């Protein structure tokens, strides 16, 4: 995630893009994540907007995200993301909401290799909470990861993460581009051990 969801990524693009994403880390059709977004590159400040939805009618998490990024030089990029999240469930009529900020850095030491650092949900503010003691949103997360393009159509991605619940979590995945603009993704994470599959189009 430190590379894939890093707000500094918007500073990598030179063309306007619209992208569609779907992934499912639980292998259950009701627990997939569907997203759409676009990126508007600009030499002064690039901008990206994303909307994603996780779950089904009885339980749904919705995320609206605005990302801004700046290229500092040939190797360094920085970015900030602002999120608005809400949770809807049949268990309660209340709709918890949260505002949060992500801070990201990207470093390109050599061609075809990206190294990223991401601080998620720092800070975060609960706009509306459950009156019960149900935890609705995750806390802060610090992630370091990489993205390596082995060949033109194959990427390897890895991430190490630390958060309030886990000292560290590992993620590893691949992305294959069978034809232009279409991506197939597969990966696995630890704590708990979960595989994931996904597709993307842009």
Put a short name on every predicted segment.
Residues 1-202:
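Subset of outer-membrane beta-barrel
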């Amino acid at each position: 995630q430190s590379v894939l969801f890093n707000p500094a990524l918007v500073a990598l693009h030179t063309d306007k893009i619209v992208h569609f994403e779907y992934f499912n880390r639980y292998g259950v059709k009701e627990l997939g994540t569907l997203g759409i977004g676009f990126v508007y590159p600009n030499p002064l400040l690039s901008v990206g907007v994303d909307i994603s939805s996780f779950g089904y009618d009885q339980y749904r998490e919705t995320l609206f995200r605005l990302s801004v990024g700046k290229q500092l030089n040939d190797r360094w990029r920085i970015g900030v993301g602002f999120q608005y999240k809400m949770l809807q469930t049949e268990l309660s009529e209340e709709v918890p909401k949260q505002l949060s900020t992500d801070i990201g850095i990207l470093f390109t030491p050599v061609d075809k290799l990206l190294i990223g650092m991401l601080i998620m949900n720092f800070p975060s503010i609960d706009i509306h909470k459950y009156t019960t003691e149900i935890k609705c949103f995750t806390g802060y997360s610090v992630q370091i990861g990489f993205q390596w393009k082995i060949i033109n159509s194959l990427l390897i991605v890895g991430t190490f993460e630390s958060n309030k619940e886990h000292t560290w979590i590992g993620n590893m995945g691949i992305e294959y581009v069978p034809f232009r603009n279409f991506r197939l993704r597969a990966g696995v994470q630890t704590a708990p051990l979960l595989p994931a599959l996904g597709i993307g189009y842009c």
